[in-house]
């Protein structure tokens, strides 16, 4: 409910309502709540008010999935549970999840919430890959060995929580898209080779890298280009080999580690 101050949902709702060929039961609609100007807010009152606003803007009676956008340091799990009960029993929300939450934060919520938390949406791309790096670089003195997120990937797989990857084409530190960027020449060269091999675009290969992971992740991305959307969808039909997956990972992580060492040396 913060994107464009809700305008994104208004535009989507208007577009959906204007096309009689679209049927609500054929579309899965997901939204988030929990951020207000200047603070995070997972209180019962804010969650309920947010969902009512979301439904009004989307011109629909229910959400298929509601996510708690970010952890609220002042969260009272009992309030979240009470809000979820109201939303579920009223039919306004069918499924629930979180975004950018660590395992213990999820476990704390799930202790009180009766409905299963089925999604955790986190940042993940080839260059932003700590989600998998800390699992491979165990007992190493490398940047990737630092577990910032408490074995998040393993926890979600153990508890049947679907991971959604946001900003799947993003570089670290919000520097923009890595595809075609001079920041990652080796990675982009290897992506182009694979794109030619499979007869697809660079975008398709970058998306296929995420989908190749056995956690069965989902991509969360936005575009104003129908062509690019089709390129992303095409990734569902590409299965990179194990060697190709690691080749792309190493091309990105070697650059990221180099930057980290340079930064540390300059401190």
PLM region descriptions:
Residues 43-57:
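Short, acidic/polar
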Residues 15-24, 55-58, 110-113:
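Acidic (Asp/Glu)-rich catalytic clusters
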Residues 256-263:
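Conserved small/polar residues in nucleotide/adenosyl-binding loops
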Residues 1-27, 89, 172:
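N-terminal binding-site loop/beta-alpha segment at the start of enzyme catalytic domains
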Residues 58-74:
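Active-site groove signature of glycoside hydrolases
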Residues 71, 75-251:
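Beta/alpha (TIM)-barrel catalytic core signal, keyed to glycine-rich beta->alpha loops juxtaposed to Asp/Glu
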Residues 1-11, 36-41, 72-76, 103-104, ...:
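Acidic-and-aromatic substrate-binding clefts and catalytic sites of carbohydrate-active enzymes
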Residues 25-37, 122-126:
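A short, structured active-site edge motif that brings together acidic residues
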């Amino acid at each position: 409910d913060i994107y464009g101050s809700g305008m994104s949902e208004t535009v989507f709702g208007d577009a959906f309502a204007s096309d009689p060929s679209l049927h609500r039961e054929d579309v899965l609609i997901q939204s988030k709540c929990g951020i207000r100007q200047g603070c995070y807010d997972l209180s019962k009152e804010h969650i309920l008010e947010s969902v009512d606003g979301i439904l009004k803007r989307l011109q629909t009676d229910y959400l298929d999935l509601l996510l708690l956008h970010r952890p609220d340091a002042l969260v009272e799990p009992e309030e979240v549970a009470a809000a979820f009960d109201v939303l579920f029993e009223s039919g306004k929300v069918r499924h629930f999840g979180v975004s950018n939450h660590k395992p213990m934060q999820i476990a704390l919520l799930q202790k009180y919430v009766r409905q299963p938390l089925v999604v955790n949406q986190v940042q993940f791309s080839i260059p932003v890959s700590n989600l998998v790096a800390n699992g491979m670089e165990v007992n190493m003195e490398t940047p990737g060995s630092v577990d910032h997120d408490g074995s998040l990937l393993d926890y979600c797989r153990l508890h049947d929580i679907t991971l959604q990857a946001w900003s799947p084409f993003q570089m670290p530190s919000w520097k923009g898209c890595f595809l075609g960027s001079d920041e990652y020449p080796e990675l982009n060269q290897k992506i182009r080779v694979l794109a030619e091999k499979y007869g697809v675009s660079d975008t398709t290969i970058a998306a296929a890298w995420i989908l190749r992971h056995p956690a069965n992740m989902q991509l969360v991305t936005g575009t104003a280009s129908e062509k690019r959307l089709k390129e992303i969808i095409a990734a569902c039909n590409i299965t990179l080999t194990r060697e190709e997956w690691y080749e792309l990972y190493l091309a990105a992580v070697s650059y990221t580690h180099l930057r980290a060492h340079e930064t540390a040396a300059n401190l």
